[in-house]
């Protein structure tokens, strides 16, 4: 019974998590499609025409951190490939700059620059990159999985990994609990859902270009539940096969590529991971930061300049590498900061405004969304209270249980949205009289 129960949890985890992600993306996506505005402008409906700048800056700061983290991840794949050369390996081991090896710094700057080349040509180039990057990554992943399965002597979901090894790996990843247990799987699912916290907020940056509501749902269906579940299966098969071949649990593509005898397979793995990471980085972080920063200073900073500022901040963060350490802890801590914002925006759009937004007033500093001097006090209070429980207490104090931080984003959404709903009921918005 226990084995069946555990297996059912393993089966349900990617399905349930991907459906939650799909649902949340649709909620934000529909708002973007209907209003035709990006996240910083949509936020004006709930935060006020000036208060939205606060929401935009929070998202921009998070985007800069993620931009640096994803760039570092992609450059790590390059490093794993380069150190196969004895001279480069020696350079990697003996040269240190800015708290990193010289090779790591060079690879980081190269990946950082490559992203700028893609981005500086505008959103159409970003779209074309995504069009070919997605299929290319899938083809490479399948080749990698098939190659490892052949080398392992067959395909199997029976991993045969010792429990002590699994315990070490889950602890390294920042996930508590015994592998396969209910609470460990819950933590993995929560981290997976939280991973998309930044994109939930700014998905309307992309959905505003959709033809209709159905197009948003169809695109999300194929891109999220279908793609996520299939990709999880392939990744799982690859990890199991790699364990059977190399006797180690290798969680990162660059770790697998470092084991290959073939330069061709190593290059394929490195390029696959780099292309996939760059695709995520450009869409989820660069575009968002560019829109957010340019929205705060629209007269001085356009989309491209906003993106360049975000890229420079990510470059400046590299010596400090705040993303190094437990991946799950980083995802949950940084994602939690955006929970209250999402809760407030969704509650305002669907429960307070009932989906009826005066788009013209979003661009009028003296219009319906001026609130108190351009700031909606209800949203500010809800953000503050939500942030206390989602970010401040779990990350900077020991007042809450250790497990709380894993679900910080969820608490942020619920508490931030709940407080906003109560305050909007007690202090309904007042529409300024026409001048």
Features from the language model and the residues they span:
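Hydrophobic, membrane-embedded alpha-helices of multi-pass small-molecule transporters
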Residues: 107-108, 147-152, 167-238, 263-283, ...
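Transmembrane alpha-helical segments of multi-pass small-molecule transport proteins
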Residues: 56, 83-120, 135-144, 188-203, ...
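Single conserved hydrophobic/aromatic residue that forms the stacking wall/gate
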Residues: 1-11
């Amino acid at each position: 019974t226990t084995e069946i129960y555990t297996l059912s949890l393993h089966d349900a985890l990617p399905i349930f998590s991907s459906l939650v992600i799909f649902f949340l993306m649709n909620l934000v996506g529909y708002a973007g499609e209907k209003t035709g505005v990006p996240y910083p402008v949509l936020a004006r409906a709930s935060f006020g025409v000036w208060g939205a700048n606060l929401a935009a800056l929070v998202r921009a700061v998070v985007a800069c951190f993620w931009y640096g983290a994803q760039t570092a991840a992609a450059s790590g794949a390059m490093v794993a490939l380069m150190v196969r050369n004895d001279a480069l390996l020696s350079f990697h081991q003996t040269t240190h700059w800015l708290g990193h090896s010289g090779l790591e710094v060079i690879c980081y700057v190269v990946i950082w620059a490559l992203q700028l080349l893609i981005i500086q040509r505008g959103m159409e180039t970003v779209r074309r990159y995504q069009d070919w990057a997605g299929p290319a990554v899938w083809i490479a992943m399948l080749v990698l999985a098939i190659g490892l399965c052949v080398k392992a002597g067959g395909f199997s979901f029976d991993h045969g990994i010792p429990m002590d090894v699994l315990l070490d790996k889950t602890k390294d990843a920042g996930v508590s609990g015994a592998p396969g247990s209910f609470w460990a799987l819950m933590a993995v699912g929560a981290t997976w859902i939280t991973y998309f916290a930044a994109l939930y907020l700014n998905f309307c940056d992309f959905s505003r270009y959709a033809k209709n509501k159905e197009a948003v749902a169809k695109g999300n269906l194929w891109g999220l539940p279908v793609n996520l579940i299939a990709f999880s299966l392939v990744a799982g098969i690859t990890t199991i096969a790699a364990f059977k071949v190399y006797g180690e649990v290798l969680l990162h593509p660059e770790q697998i590529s470092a084991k290959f005898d073939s330069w061709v397979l190593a290059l394929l793995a490195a390029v696959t991971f780099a292309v996939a990471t760059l695709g995520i980085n450009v869409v989820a972080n660069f575009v968002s930061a560019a829109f957010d920063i340019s929205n705060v200073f629209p007269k001085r900073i356009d989309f491209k300049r906003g993106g360049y500022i975000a890229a420079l901040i990510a470059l400046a963060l590299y010596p400090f590498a705040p993303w190094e350490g437990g991946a799950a802890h980083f995802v949950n801590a940084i994602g939690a900061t955006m929970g209250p914002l999402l809760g407030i925006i969704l509650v305002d759009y669907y429960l307070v405004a009932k989906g009826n937004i005066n788009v013209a007033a979003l661009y009028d500093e003296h219009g319906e969304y001026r609130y108190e001097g351009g700031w909606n006090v209800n949203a500010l209070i809800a953000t503050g209270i939500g942030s206390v429980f989602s970010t401040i207490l779990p990350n900077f104090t020991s007042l809450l249980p250790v497990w709380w931080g894993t679900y910080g984003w969820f608490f942020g959404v619920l508490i931030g949205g709940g407080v906003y709903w109560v305050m909007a009921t007690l202090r309904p918005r007042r529409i300024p009289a026409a001048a």
